[in-house]
């Protein structure tokens, strides 16, 4: 999807709001809202294929999920899996996705030679209530310069190099 998943465009065929799912520079499929339920899985499987195809050479995989951005459309396999409603269900699905990518790296014996960074770009969308996420004890949200709007996690995974359980208080940008 070339834009945020809340920015669908009307089609010429009836004015429905759709989201173009791209493969390289071509539209592979036009997704209506409910079609977004398949997108995390589609991105994940494409990432696994990419890793497998490129396992014998250096690669950079950039996997920017549209998940956890309103409107919320977790796959039906994850419906009701969390105690935090639809937003939490989509968090569960992204957790599955990251696990699938990490497992692929392990199976191909690439895990000790691959740095994986997991991060976010902003805090929750306060105007959407719980459906937009929560910043916990931090004040502020998306579009705000308070900590709740700009402080996001960054997790580094690199077995044998990045020591588990360590943390750093340095500043980074996404």
Task: Annotate each predicted stretch with a short phrase.
Residues 55-61, 110-116, 150-152:
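Loop/turn elements at helix/coil->beta-strand transitions in domains of secreted/extracellular proteins
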């Amino acid at each position: 999807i070339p834009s945020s998943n809340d920015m669908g465009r009307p089609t010429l065929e009836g004015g429905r709001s759709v989201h173009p799912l791209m493969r390289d520079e071509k539209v592979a499929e036009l997704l209506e809202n409910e079609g977004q339920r398949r997108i995390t899985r589609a991105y994940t499987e494409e990432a696994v294929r990419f890793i497998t195809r490129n396992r014998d050479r250096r690669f950079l995989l950039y996997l920017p999920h549209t998940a956890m951005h309103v409107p919320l459309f977790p796959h039906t396999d994850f419906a009701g899996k969390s105690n935090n409603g639809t937003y939490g269900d989509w968090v569960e699905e992204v957790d599955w996705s990251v696990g699938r990518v990490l497992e692929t790296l392990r199976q191909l014996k690439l895990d000790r030679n691959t740095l994986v960074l997991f991060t976010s770009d902003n805090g929750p969308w306060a105007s959407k209530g719980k459906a937009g996420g929560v910043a916990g004890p931090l004040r502020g949200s998306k579009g705000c310069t308070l900590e709740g709007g700009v402080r996001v996690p960054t997790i580094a995974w690199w077995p044998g190099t990045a020591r588990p359980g360590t943390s750093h208080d340095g500043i980074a940008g996404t």
